[in-house]
Amino acid sequence: MHGVAMPHRKKLPPAYETVSPREASPKQIQGNFAVALGGLAGNNAHGAGVIEALYRCGRKPRLISCTSGQIRFTYAYLRGLTPGSEVNPYSMLQRHFNSAQPFKDLTDVNLNFKLMTWPFQQIRPSVPEFSADMLGNLTRSMKQFLANPRDFSVWREMYRMMPARTLVSQDTLFDPDVFSDIARLFNADTGPDGHGIGVMFNAYDFVKGEEYVFMNGTAATLTGHAPGAGSGSRPWIKYQAITEEAVRNALRLYEYGFHEEGDLLDGAYLRGLILSEIPNKGNGIDTIVVGRPLASCWLGDAPSSLIELRDMQTEVNFLGSYLGEKGQIELINQLLRTGRPVAPPANATPITILEVEMDRQRGWWEYVLEDEAVFNSAFHRTRTEICPRLELPMAA
């Protein structure tokens, strides 16, 4: 209402017990469910908690869709399916804490640590590139002034001076095979030693305005989308097989700038959670467990600064794409249930969505740091609220 100030409300999430390292390898029984994990900077611990809890409950999905940083944790999950493996979502997160933010949740100390140890960070600040990038932008402004001084704006050019590149990936510097290893494991889904789980993730071509959804063989079979084909109802979506280059592109952040070849970026910027490909009549999936890296509404104080406003804009953008995906599934459920306003499509199938959403407000500055409390919360809520609702197939 006009004249009424937006309320300020601060939700304090409950504290959860710290999760301990794996001590057992419970038998994994594949259920009639898929998992959709959304990646978002410092909130990746949330999805890691969801998938780790499912493992410790012995619930194995038929299909995993993942975006951005959740690609790494899906890789860790698949590695962790091998009994005795030292790589799993829990251990990957702990290694991140030890190497990139050893001072727990102390923001300033951890950020200073990242700056001082940037040569050794997997994703580092663009410290050595900063001067050259600034000079490049200054040169661009000077050329525009000389070419058209009448339309030149000092204010506009001041805002354009800060470089787009603020981070640099050093993935292949520390592990030259990191992207090929991820692709190889994702594609190791069939055969007697295969993990048997469909995997798909996405990337976005910002020049063509197209989304690429990369799938392994099991995912292609479950969804009915063959690699090389396009979407019949959404012509901007193309389906491709998983390759090393696909993994590299799907992990390419805005903040890396645009100095590298290619036009594909992290697909989470376009579609943070991949849901609509999962329902397909006859594939045996009737439930999707969704690891939402954001809450469904604003939980913190109303924004009063520009940086807080940028956080709200980011959250609304990510929520919008997810609600579109979820709404499509709920519409099909309604058509199947009522037959109105039209009959459902021939391949329609009912889907139950079980959400594990973020239970706390994490702002712009928290996006550069993971939080163990986020992992603990997602883990315990998945174990107590989601796992009991996942029916396991009856024994033959």
Task: Mark where each language-model region is.
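Patatin-like phospholipase
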Residues: 2-64, 75-396
